[in-house]
Design a protein with these regions (language model features):
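Classical nucleotidyltransferase
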Residues: 1-88, 168-172, 198
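Phosphate/ribose-recognition catalytic cores of enzymes acting on nucleotide-derived substrates
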Residues: 78-203
Length: 203
């Protein structure tokens, strides 16, 4: 048996334990891994990646992770405004567990269904134009017309497009969403799912 950990690993009350105290006990082999560095300056750590995600810096987070950050969950019924009012249907995700949520805003990304990946415009926020008080995670899956209710999917994030805004009218919102869809296409044309082919089978 062996324990693989970083050289700065600590445990126990007030972080009083370290790899040195573990090695002194001689109960298990300790394999210490030197930290990964970004540009030989900043250490790549889980807390650094979490901060990048929370700030909406998805490109930086993905570069540190080596794969696209994703949230897993089940598609549930929403208000159906996307299909009935905006004519831009969205799939509302109920996360399976606690995830670090990216900053409120609109993102280019993918929806994974089974072993297939579909381009998607993802929104995290409150839909302020409609006065929502509950934060939602929803995606408009491009050129997709299958029934997703009850399906297990993953939303994968590639790049933030813009912050969330409150629009003066439904028409103004629709116009912006159409622009967001086009921006999503442009981003994903440059950063396609094939670019992650070396790690995609690990997701």
């Amino acid at each position: 048996q062996a324990l693989v950990c970083g050289t700065d690993f600590h445990y126990a009350s007030h972080n009083s334990g370290s790899i040195h105290t573990l090695k002194a006990q001689e109960r298990i082999e300790i394999i210490a891994i030197d930290p990964l560095m970004e540009d030989q300056i900043e250490k790549i750590s889980s807390s650094k990646i979490e901060k990048e995600i929370e700030a909406g810096r998805i490109e930086e987070a993905n570069a540190s992770l080596g794969y696209m950050y994703s949230i897993d969950g089940t598609i549930r019924h929403g208000f159906q405004r996307g299909s009935k009012i905006l004519n831009i249907p969205t799939a509302n995700l109920e996360p399976d567990s606690l995830f670090t949520l990216p900053a409120i805003g609109v993102y280019a990304g993918y929806m994974k269904l089974k072993n297939s990946y579909y381009p998607a415009m993802i929104n995290i926020g409150f839909n302020p134009t409609f006065g929502n008080t509950h934060k939602s995670i929803e995606a408009h899956v491009l050129d997709f017309d299958q029934d997703l209710y009850g399906k297990k999917v993953s939303f994968l994030f590639v790049q933030k497009i813009r912050p969330e805004h409150k629009f003066d009218s439904i028409e103004a919102l629709k116009t912006q969403l159409k622009q967001d869809i086009e921006t999503t296409r442009q981003i994903l044309a440059k950063k396609s799912i094939q670019d992650w082919s070396s790690v995609i089978n690990l997701l």
